[in-house]
Amino acid sequence: MLASYASDPLKSRGRLYKEIPNTYRNEFERDRDRIIHTNAFRRLQYKTQVFINHEGDHYRNRLTHSLEVSAVARSVANTLNLSSDLAETIALAHDLGHTPFGHAGERALNACMRDYNGFSHNAQSLKILTLLEKRYAAYNGVNLTWEVLEGIVKHNGPITCEINEYIAEYNKQNDLELDTYASAEAQIAALADDISYISHDLEDSIGAKIIDFNSLAELKYIDQYVFALKSKFKNISSSCLIYEVVRKLMHELITDLLWQTKENLNKEKITDIDEIRNLNYQLVDFTANTNERIKETKKFLHERVYKSNKITAISLKCTKIVQGLFKVYMDDINLLPVNWKMLIDSNEIYSKARVIADYIAGMTDRFAIQAYNQLC
């Protein structure tokens, strides 16, 4: 049974374009299915998480990451008697707007778009789901519920300054109440993302031999996990050890998140969803001690993994590809597919740049590499 402060699909604020309710799926389940059936969702399997898609078969990509985030989000929401369907749906959609080549690709495209209001993967997710996906005759996008769109846009908190151009424009026709917090389910999806990526980036980095267990000792709490596991399992292999460490890490993070969130619910005496939105802080959270551990782990990953020689070398190649493609399309729009070229408003430079950015952002790693090799 859903809590009184949960997002109830029967009380959804609805869709921009009204539709007849489905007889066997609730509104958030319908949204989940719509997202899964988008072209953008399928392309995630060929988009970088940390390691380039062709670097190895077992490294995570944007699709596997999104599935892992959705699993964590669903479990946490279920335990708190919140809408697991909504939490899962937001989690599945949270990375749809990412460029090829992960954050290196996004930084490169944002630099290309510096004179055209920049590029944001979060805003791009909204744009994909409300404009760029063409699956219905009656409208652009996939016509998701207000709650899902709110969660995608505001899962990291209220947006009160430097509002992205597309988010601001869309908000005029469908007010997402940008100055408030999103639902508890959206907040869960955001922290499920943190739990998943710090855990699994550690795992993948060990597998790629970018870091080892000696360097992991810099994280004292992780070193304690390693010591306890080696003491319990004398002959444990390195490959099994990292799986056990990640399992322990995820369990402790999820347990901590549940405890602190329940404390906040009780402290604030929350009875309905609007009270969550109007709080002056994020309701769903970790304890202060765990937040410090997460910050420490993110710093470790940034210094030891994302700035490592291997990842830096790959990032430089990816930057060259994205910037090269942007330049070649800006120089000659006839190189764009006809259906994309038709979206440009009379060859006006701002419109041209935005359409090109949308096109490049939608590419998979391998498609971008192929296009670069053909055109640059």
Swiss-Prot record:
Residues 62-198 form the HD domain. Keywords: Hydrolase. Transmembrane segments: none annotated. Disulfide bonds: none annotated. InterPro entries: dGTPase (IPR006261), dGTPase-like (IPR050135), dNTPase_2 (IPR023023), HD/PDEase_dom (IPR003607), HD_domain (IPR006674), PHydrolase_assoc_dom (IPR026875). Coiled coil: none annotated. PROSITE patterns: HD (PS51831). GO terms for molecular function: dGTPase activity. It comes from the Bacteria. CDD domains: HDc. The keyword Hydrolase applies. GO terms for biological process: dGTP catabolic process. Pfam families: HD, HD_assoc. Belongs to the dGTPase family. Type 2 subfamily. This is Deoxyguanosinetriphosphate triphosphohydrolase-like protein. It comes from Rickettsia canadensis (strain McKiel). The lineage of its organism: Bacteria, Pseudomonadati, Pseudomonadota, Alphaproteobacteria, Rickettsiales.
